[in-house]
Structure formats: C-alpha cells, structure tokens
C-alpha cells in the first residue's frame, strides 16, 4: 500500500475505529515536522479485534504493524459496585473510586534491570548488571457485603424505572461498626469501558457528562437533609436536659420570625403535642420551638460532634464536607430552619454515620 489513505480503512474495519482516526495516527509527525518512526494506534483492544488485525496483516502481507500483548484491568461483574471500585485508564492508573484512592498501593513497583550493551553481541562480558525485583501491588479488602450490594443494586434499578427518576442512590451501613455494606448509584457505568454511556447523562460537554457518570453522589454530593435531621436536634435537646417527654409544643401550622412566615408541612397544624409526638408527626413548628430552646451555640456544637462539616473518612475520593453555618453568623431564622433540617448541607455518608452514632 502506497499511502496511509489506502491502508487506514482496512485497519479501521479490523479494530472498529473511525478511518479518520486511524489515518491521523498513521500520519503522526514529530515536533520537527518529520514523520514519526512509530505511533500507538490503540491500546487494550479485545481479543477479537487483535485477531482481526493479525489476519489482515497476514492476508495483505503488511509490514510495520505490530500487535503486542498488553495488560488490562478486568472487572468480571461489569457495572456492579462501579462507583465504589472505580476504573483505570489505559496505563492502569486509577481514575475514580478505590482505584484512584489506593492507586499507589494497588499499582506496586515495576522491576528494573540496568546493564551495559553493545550493538553486535548484546551485553558486555564480565560486566555486572543491576537488578531491582518488582513489588506486587497490595490487596484492598472492602467492607461491602456482596449479597446486600446485589439486593441494593436491584432495588435501585427498579426504583429508577418505577418512579421515572433521574437518579437513585442506596447506602447500607452496619449501625454497630459503621462499616458500609452497600453503596449504589443509578444510573452507573461499566468500569471495563469507563468512557461508554456518557450520552445518557446531561452536560454541555463530554467531559461534564463523564464526570456526572463517574460521580459517587453518596460521597461527592451534599443536600439539605430535611426532616431526617430532626433526630439530631432531638438528641441534642435530650443530652442537654432541655426537654422531657412531658413537655408540650403547640403547632398552629406556622411560626413567624421577622418578616418570614415558616410553615409546618401540615397547613392546619398539629395542635398541642408532647415531645414524642413532634418526633412522631415530624412537626416543623415543634422543632423550631425546640431549636430556640437549644440555641445556636449548643446546636452547632452538637452538629460538629456528630461529624457534620468534616470528612467522614470513608476512603473514597472527592468527599464533600457540606456547609455548616457558624453560630456567630446565624440569625434566628437560620437557627429554627436548621433545627428541622434546612439551611445546612450534609453528604449521605456523614448522615448515616451520625444517625448510627
């Protein structure tokens, strides 16, 4: 074949690439503008692609094309646990998840041999070569329970369909040890092909779509916890001796602070309730009154004690700390809304760890 234009379509068909991409590789130039002596066309191809290319080389008697063995991380369960495990690039470097967090431990150290050579006969006689033995990468053992993870993945996938949701996340934690037993985000991706599937995600650029696909929302995203935070407020009041089971709270449907009227979820109000009943009814007004009793300094103190506003130490990359308003900057409106779960933000792992404390 006289030109890359003639050869490119044949190679492209064999390995499943675009002809223009193959030709660009064949026409690779050095910085000086001269033709490059060699270029890597594609890495980590499947066996069938390699066989196709070898057959083409043999049939067309092509020279200068080398199909060489390479290493590739293989994930036998596909997308299972993908946001936790993460994935690697073509050089085996971690991109996301545990692969990124523990890249240096998993990679090991390659061996080396240093020796003197000459062009005709190879090594010089009587010279001493220096050897450095390779060091295997270490194993990383996860707390994930495979059976619980499988069930959680199935539930999340079904919820995505049943509720026509944009995304579903599931987190399961052992309340006694804090160990994470399952962590699921749907939709997910296949770490064997970590760049495939970005068309299912929204973004202005492919890079933005890719980051959304890889994003472990349970660790990387924060949210206003809402009513689930009322447990933290209730425990704070109990620990400080500011409330008893016989204390009563009156809810008429809203309370006004300054110019802002803040409503309970039940527009007609819950009437007079005990401490236990404001928890049972998830009454916003009752928890606003409880927040006033606690005060900003004490509430922030307990928020920090429960681990909010700081990383949980989950050992996954990019954990978001969340935003916790300082007591000195807190208005009365901030105080009462924080008491029932608004204003501050947390991540899912933080909340689960706090709830299980």
Task: Please give the residue ranges for each predicted region.
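Conserved, well-ordered alpha-helix/loop/beta-strand core segments that scaffold catalytic motifs
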Residues: 38, 125-168
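Short secondary-structure junction motifs
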Residues: 36, 62, 165-168, 244-246, ...
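Soluble periplasmic/extracytoplasmic beta-strand elements of cell-envelope proteins
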Residues: 40-44, 66-68, 83-87, 141-143, ...
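Small/polar-residue-rich segments within soluble enzyme cores
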Residues: 2-13, 24-137
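Solvent-exposed, polar/charged alpha-helical surfaces in well-ordered, non-transmembrane soluble domains
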Residues: 2-13, 20, 24, 43, ...
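Beta-lactam-recognizing serine transpeptidase/beta-lactamase-like catalytic domain environment
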Residues: 118-128, 144, 176-227, 232-357
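Acidic/histidine-enriched alpha-helical segments
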Residues: 21-32, 72, 165-177, 250-252, ...
């Amino acid at each position: 074949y006289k030109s890359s234009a003639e050869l490119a379509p044949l190679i492209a068909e064999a390995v499943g690439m675009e002809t223009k991409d193959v030709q660009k590789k064949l026409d690779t130039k050095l910085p000086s503008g001269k033709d490059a002596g060699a270029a890597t066309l594609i890495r980590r191809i499947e066996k069938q692609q390699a066989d196709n290319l070898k057959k083409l080389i043999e049939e067309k008697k092509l020279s200068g094309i080398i199909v060489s063995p390479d290493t590739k991380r293989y994930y036998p369960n596909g997308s299972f646990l993908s946001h936790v495990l993460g994935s690697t690039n073509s050089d085996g470097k971690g991109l996301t998840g545990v692969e990124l967090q523990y890249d240096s431990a998993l990679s090991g150290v390659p061996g080396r041999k240093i020796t003197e050579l000459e062009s005709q006969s190879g090594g010089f006689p009587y010279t001493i070569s220096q050897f450095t033995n390779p060091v295997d990468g270490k194993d990383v053992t996860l707390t994930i329970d495979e059976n619980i993870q499988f069930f959680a993945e199935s539930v999340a996938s079904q919820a995505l369909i049943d509720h026509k949701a944009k995304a579903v996340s599931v987190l399961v934690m052992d309340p006694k040890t804090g160990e994470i037993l399952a962590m699921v985000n749907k939709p997910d991706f296949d770490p064997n092909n970590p760049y495939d599937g970005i068309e299912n995600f929204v973004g202005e650029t492919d890079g933005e779509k890719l980051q959304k696909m890889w994003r472990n929302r349970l660790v990387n995203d924060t949210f206003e916890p809402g009513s689930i935070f009322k447990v933290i407020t209730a425990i704070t009041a109990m620990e400080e001796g500011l409330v008893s089971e016989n204390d009563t709270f009156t809810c008429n449907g809203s309370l006004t602070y300054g110019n802002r009227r803040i409503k309970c979820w039940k527009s007609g109000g819950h009437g007079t309730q005990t401490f236990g009943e404001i928890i049972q009814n998830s009454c916003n007004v009752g928890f606003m009154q409880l927040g006033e009793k606690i005060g900003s300094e004490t509430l922030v103190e307990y928020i920090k004690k429960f681990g909010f506003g700081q990383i949980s130490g989950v050992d996954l990359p990019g954990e978001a700390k969340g935003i916790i308003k300082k007591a000195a900057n807190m208005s009365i409106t901030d105080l009462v809304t924080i008491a029932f779960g608004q204003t501050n933000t947390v991540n899912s792992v933080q909340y689960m760890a706090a709830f299980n404390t």
